[in-house]
Design a protein with these regions (language model features):
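Short, basic/aromatic recognition patches
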Residues: 1-5
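Mg2+-dependent phosphoryl-transfer enzymes with acidic/Ser/Thr/Gly-rich catalytic loops
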Residues: 9, 35, 166, 171-247
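A structural signal for isolated positions on well-ordered beta-strands in alpha/beta enzyme cores
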Residues: 13, 52-54, 74, 153, ...
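Active-site phosphate-binding/coordination module
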Residues: 33-119
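Substrate-recognition "cap/lid" segment bordering the active-site pocket of phosphatases
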Residues: 76-78, 84-101, 155-185
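Charged, glycine-interspersed solvent-exposed loop segments at helix/strand-loop junctions
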Residues: 114-131, 153-164
């Protein structure tokens, strides 16, 4: 979109992906580090927006709480399979034995450069950038999912494949948050970097909101774009400076 991305307005509701969006991408998810300055920015933005700031990620809620501790924000984890708003926690897709069946042939590869994250309701399979594992996984995983009970879908992301329940996506997570305070009645703004964020973009746009794509992959539907997570963090800081009262 032509023009300059506006700063955050007080009537917005922010929905933020984590890896590759708020934080620079790393090949091993356990290696990511959340700067204390980012925790402080998110906490202050949440206060300025009346609590209408949520994390929407492929990571589990437990992992997100660990990363951002002691900050405790509204979150949707596992691509929207689970979500928390206040003290209310919803699981939108129960676990299925089919997930273990899908993962079994991946474990059987015994490939040390493949990392399998079984998150309970979903899974992520990470592979090395320079290796041939992607080709093997691209052939194996669709076959494994086809042999399952049809409860899961396969999503390709950066150096990973996500196995996610069919019934969930990040857009539905946005809709769930927007149904109640403090999100209801606000302008939704979804910020992400991958194909798995497209449903979130669509949900925000359908409600008259904004969609912001971060990083080298260009979205087909997000009107706004930021080159890097560093640019996003700088924009959040600039916005916060205008939202907070002068000292």
């Amino acid at each position: 979109m032509a023009g300059t991305l506006p700063i955050i307005a007080r009537d917005w509701a922010l929905f933020l992906d984590v890896d590759g969006t708020l934080l620079d991408f790393v090949s091993r998810p356990e290696a990511v580090i959340v700067p204390q300055s980012l925790r402080q920015t998110l906490a202050a933005l949440s206060r300025a927006l009346g609590g209408a700031l949520a994390i929407v990620s492929g990571r589990s809620i437990a992992d997100l709480d660990r990363l951002f501790a002691p900050l405790r924000l509204p979150v949707a984890g596992q691509h929207g399979a689970e979500a928390r708003r206040g003290e209310r926690i919803c699981v939108f897709a129960p676990g299925s034995p089919a997930l273990a069946s899908i993962l079994a042939p991946v474990y059987a590869l015994r490939e040390p450069t493949i990392l399998i994250e079984n998150k309970g309701l979903s899974a992520a399979i990470h592979y090395a950038e320079a290796g041939s594992e992607r080709d093997a996984l691209s052939e194996l995983l669709p076959q494994a999912i086809a042999r399952s009970d049809g409860a899961y879908q396969l999503l390709a992301s950066h150096l990973a494949f996500d196995i996610v329940p069919h019934a969930v996506n990040k857009g539905r997570a946005v809709d769930w948050f927007m149904a109640d305070a403090p999100f209801a009645g606000r302008v939704p703004v979804f910020i992400g970097d991958e194909r798995t964020d497209e449903d979130g973009f669509a949900a925000a746009l359908a409600r008259g909101g904004h969609a912001i794509n971060v990083g080298p992959r260009r979205s087909n539907i997000a009107p706004w774009h930021m080159p890097t997570p560093q640019d996003l963090r700088a924009w959040l800081d600039r916005s916060l400076a205008t939202l907070e009262p002068s000292q």
